[in-house]
């Protein structure tokens, strides 16, 4: 039997906190997880599942997160600095009752990550880094609201960019959309990774193998890790 925490009777209150009986809530899901485990599948632990209340809290956090990126979109232009972007994100986040998750996280000194041109990720904003016409910059924004985490990034083109850079940005967005389209109940993480990798390579690009996506919600970085290389 797959060991996924305490064992519940059919008429016990479900472990998820819904108040429903186990047989009316997560029993069928746990039975399916056990079947997969017995087949040799890697099964993620029960505590990664989010309750309805958790999901609503994460959505509220995500609304602030997206709003902060929209705030940047209204202001970013040639001549601004990545330090400006950091201040915009910080002020928007705080004004909406939230906390910038990166600030002081494992020593990170700023409220957002800004990665310009060839920087892959986790660039540190600076008042000395001035954006110029033709730059592309990734703004990686993470937000805590009422204890719930959200995390997203967005690519920005500064003024007019070269066709090559524009195509890179466009294909990257398409890769994200391909990965999202591959997500389905009882699917595999490899389905998502493969969709991202296949779309990138079909377009003539490569993926960064050392980094990937991750779970989020109750903590900043949760399992599972979602790589950009995989088999369906």
Please give the residue ranges for each predicted region.
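Active-site neighborhoods and metal-handling regions in enzymes and metal-associated proteins
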Residues: 6-10, 18-232
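Short cysteine-rich clusters marking metal-coordination/redox-active sites
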Residues: 14
